[in-house]
C-alpha cells in the first residue's frame, strides 16, 4: 500500500499559493494589489521548501530538534489556544506539547469549570452556573524584571468575552480572571516592564489591554445607528490585584499592544481611524495609526480626577481622543501615522524602536521611541518625525520578531514567507542611502503565516537561537484527517545568517501568539502546600459526613490506593458539598474522582484540595472511583455513595 498522498492541482504549491493570494488580494485595496512581490533592494527568494534542502541539511535539522529519551528541552513556550480558550505549554526545540492550562472554558480532564474553586475564578451566574463557557485566546505575555522574564506570571486574553486571565508560573495554573468593562473584542495585551516614574520599580506592575471593536458607550441599546459615536478603550489592569486601574477613550480600533523598557510608553497599532462600521468604510483612509500612551500623564490625570465613568462601571476613563490631545505638552495620547490597516506592533530588544507591520501595505514602519517622547516634551513640532524608516518587505506583513543582533523577522501572509531584515540598514535606506541592503534573507513557510516569535525575542536577552512561525493553513503537510485541518507551527534555526527550517508541528486550531523563554527562568513546584487551600483536610481522620439540615458536607481524602471513606450515605434532596484532599506528597501522584450520573469529575494533585456542589437527587448506589491512574490497585480505588430514597 502506497503512503504517498495523491496530489491534485488544488493541493500543488503553485495552485495553492495562487488560490489563496488571489482570494486575499481580491479583498484588499488597489494599493496592495499593485505592490511588487520583492522590494527593489531585496535578494532573490530563498528556496527553503522541503524539496530544495539537501539530504545533509535535512538530517542536521532533524538532529537539532530530536531529544534523546529523558532529555529535556532548553526552552519553554507559552502558546495561545485560540477558540479552545486555553493556554498551551510547549518544550522547544522539540515542539512537544507538555501541558494545557485551562482558563476561560471548562476542561473535563482536570475538572476546570466543575470544581467550586475553578468556578469562582471563571465567574458564575446567580444560580451557580458558569457565566461563559466559550473563549478565544490570542495573545500571551509574561511578567518582567530588569527587562527579562522573571517567572512570576503570564497573562492571556479572551477576545470573545473581553476577559484577561493570569497564570501563576510556579504551578502553571490560572489563578485570576478579570472581565474588562466598556470593551468588546479585547485583543492586544502586554505587561509593562518598569514604572514610568520610580526607577526602583524595574518590574511588571501593570498589564495593558487594547479593545478591537468600537461600540457605543455606554453600550445600552442607544446610538446603535450612529457609528460616529462608537469608541474603543485602552485598559490598564493591576498585575497583582487584577483590578482594572483605568481606561483611555480613544479613536480607532486596537490591534496589538507593546510597551517600552523604561515604562514611559505603551502603544497599540490601530486600524479604522475613520470610525466606520462597514468593511469598505474601515479602509478609506490611506494611513491609520500607532497610538502611544504617556503612562505618567494618564495616571496624573486620574489622580487629579480628570475622568468620567460609563454605565455601571466605576473605572475612571480619561479622554485620549485626537480632538482632545492636540497640545503635545498636555496630551495623554499621541497618534503616529502608519500605512492603512497595520497589523502588529513589536518592541525591539534594544529598547529603541517599535515596529508596525503594514498588512494592507507591503511595508514595515520603524518608530523611534525617543522621538515620540520628544514630541510629548514639546521638543518636536511634528509627531511623524518619529518615523525613522518605512520600507518594503513583501506582501501582507503581519508580525515581527527579533534576534538581538539588530535583525527583525516579519511574517508575510500573502507571500507565505518570513523576511529577515536589518533595522539599522532599513533606517539608512529610508534616509536616502539606496545602496543599503536591508533585506538579509527570505524563507518560505507552509502556509500563510500569522504570528511569529523568537527565543527571548521580546526581552533585552533576545538570543537569536530559534524562531517559531504560526501558519494558518497546513494543507498537504500532514496526514489528512477530514475537512478540519490542523494548523502548522514551523520552527527555524536563526543562529546563522540564513534561516534554516527545522520542523513542522501540527497543532489543534487555532493558536495565535506565543512567547519562548529559557527554562531556567521559571521554577515550577511539583507538589502543592496544604496552606494553599482553606478547605484542606490535613488528616484522613478528619473525614466524614457532616449534616446541617439538608446541607451536607462530605470530607474525603485520597492516598493511593484508597479513599478515606469506604462508603457514605446521603438522603434524596441533600445539598452536598464534597471536599477532597490528596494526601500524597509524591511528585506526579495525581488522583481523580468521578461520580457516575452526577456529572462530577476532577483531579487533585499532590496535597491539593478541591470541592464540588451537587444535589443528591437520584436514589441508589453510585460507585465513586479514581479516574487518574496512580497505583497498581487503581481499579480498586473507589467508594460507595449511597443515596437513600
What label would you give each PLM region?
Residues 39, 43-544, 613:
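Predominantly soluble domains enriched in secretory-pathway, periplasmic, or organellar proteins
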Residues 565-568, 599-603, 613:
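Beta-strand-rich interaction surfaces with strong enrichment in secreted/lumenal proteins
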Residues 546-572:
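N-terminal edge beta-strand
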Residues 83, 94, 160, 169-171, ...:
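A mature extracytoplasmic/lumenal domain signature
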Residues 604-645:
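Extracellular/periplasmic metallocenter environments
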Residues 1-18, 22-32:
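N-terminal secretory signal peptides
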Residues 176-177, 579-609, 632-639:
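Histidine- and aromatic-enriched segments that form or immediately flank copper-ligand environments
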